[in-house]
Amino acid sequence: MVDKPAGNAFDVLVVYHGTVMRDALVMQAANDTLDAFRGLLDDPSIMVVSVAYPEENLMIGDNLVQAEAALLWVKNQAASQLGVQIRHIFLGGHSQGGYLVTRLNTLHPTRGVIANAPGPLDLVLRCRLEEDGTIAAGEHCARLRNAYGSTTANPSAYMARSLRSFTTGYQSDILFVQGLEDSRLIQMESWPGFRQQVEACTNCKGVQFLELAGLGHTALFNSTQARDAFRAFLNARR
C-alpha cells in the first residue's frame, strides 16, 4: 500500500501493522497503520509504504520473509516501478510490526527505525502464562506448542523467536517507544530485561528509548511527546 505525494524524489517511511489474526483483516490493518504513521509526520512530502504482511496459520517470526521482501522492494525496485527517486528509507512498526522492524534492523541498513511497543519480547514467559491458565490461550502459543512442545520441555525454541533474542547487531539508529501502562504480564514484565540487553549492545548503531508514563500499547500515536520525538528522530537523519 503506497501513499505517494506529488513530486519525483522522496524519503520513504515503510510501516508495519500490529497483530492481525486473520489475513482477511490485513489490508484494513495496513491502511489504518498508514494513516496512523502519516498523522505523526510533519512533512507531507514523505512517501509512506504500509506493508500488508500475513499472519494467519504462521508462527511468530515466519512472516519476516514477507516483511523483508517489502523492504527490499522499496530498496531495489520501487524507484523504477513508480518512476521516482528514493532518497532515504526509514522503518516504523507497531506491536508485532515493531518486532519485525527491529529484526529487519539486524539484516539491512536504513536511515533509521522506530518501534512502538515491540513484541512479543519473551515467548517463554508469555506462552507459559497461557499454559498455566494465568492468561487466555491464543493461537500463536498454540502453534509453537504444536511444533515444539511446552515451554518447559523446549524453552530455547520459544526464546529463539522472541525479540529478546534480537538485541545486538542493529545496523541503523533505532528509537523504541513504550507506554508504561501496557499489559503488565505480556509486555511490561519483559520490558526492563529487553531494554537492559539492548543498552548493553556493543555492535549496535545508536539506540534511544522513550518510556511514557500513563500511556499504554499505542503510546506513540497518543502522545505529543512521542510524536515530537518521532519527528525529531526522522528529521535529524534526513
Residue ranges and their predicted role:
Residues 60, 177, 184, 190-195, ...:
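C-terminal catalytic histidine-bearing segment of alpha/beta-hydrolase fold enzymes
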Residues 1-9:
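Short beta-strand-to-loop junctions in surface cap/lid or active-site-entrance loops
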Residues 170, 176-179:
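Short beta-strand/loop motif that positions the catalytic acidic residue
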Residues 8-10, 18-58, 184:
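Short substrate-entry loop that stabilizes the transition state in hydrolases
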Residues 98-108:
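Short glycine-enriched nucleophile-adjacent loop
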Residues 69-95, 107:
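Gly/Ser-rich "nucleophile elbow"/oxyanion-hole loop immediately N-terminal to the catalytic nucleophile
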Residues 118, 123-166:
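Mobile cap/lid helix-loop segments that gate and shape the active-site cleft of serine hydrolases
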Residues 109-120:
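A conserved short beta-strand
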